[in-house]
């Protein structure tokens, strides 16, 4: 009975203990994404800004923004028309981590994102734009490495895949930094 109460108390305190041990993390990443619409693909600059809360040493939740911001991918549609495409994505999901060494950790994350995709047909006169939005899945895998400059600062590298609306997909590679609070 006492062992059961002790274990229950330990599990109840663990999220609070983890939160007080620098388990609030912020990240900023930059890289490139390959946007593909099934007819053509193009690479474009992408950025990610996010927040993670760890409810255990190896599991956490992610919230953030990922998108092409002002950059546009130059693609072709099914009729051969030149189109320019960009997207904004607000995501939420789960993160799982596995330490490899004292200084390096591998991680995987996944969840769902509300995505807004904008297509502009630049072959048309005048140009026509359409916007498509919806909730779509994403998955990512990456590594983070301690910097040695600051115990709360880490460098990251990540590969992500995200389904977008209207048959589009995004495959990204990014590098960045994470800061623990």
Regions found by a protein language model. Name each.
Residues 37-45, 71-80, 118-127, 167-173:
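Outer-membrane beta-barrel translocator domains and adjoining extracellular loop/strand segments
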Residues 25, 141, 145-147, 154, ...:
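Outer-membrane beta-barrel "beta-signal"
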Residues 15-61, 65-74, 96:
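Short glycine/proline- and aromatic-enriched beta-strand/turn motifs that initiate or cap beta-hairpins
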């Amino acid at each position: 009975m006492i062992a059961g109460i002790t274990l229950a108390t330990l599990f109840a305190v663990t999220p609070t203990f983890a939160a007080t041990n620098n388990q609030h993390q912020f990240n900023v990443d930059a890289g490139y994404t390959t946007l593909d619409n099934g007819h053509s693909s193009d690479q474009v600059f992408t950025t990610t800004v996010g927040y993670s809360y760890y409810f255990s040493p190896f599991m956490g939740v992610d919230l953030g923004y990922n998108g092409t911001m002002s950059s546009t991918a130059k693609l072709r549609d099914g009729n051969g028309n030149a189109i320019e495409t960009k997207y904004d994505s607000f995501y939420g999901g789960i993160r799982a981590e596995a330490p490899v060494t004292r200084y390096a950790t591998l991680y995987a994350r996944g969840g769902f994102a509300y995505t807004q995709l904008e297509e502009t047909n630049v072959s048309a006169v005048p140009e026509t734009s359409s916007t498509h939005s919806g909730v779509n899945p994403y998955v990512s895998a990456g590594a983070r490495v301690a910097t040695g400059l600051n115990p709360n600062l880490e460098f990251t590298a990540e590969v992500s895949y995200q389904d977008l609306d209207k048959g589009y997909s995004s495959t990204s590679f990014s590098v960045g930094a994470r800061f623990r609070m």
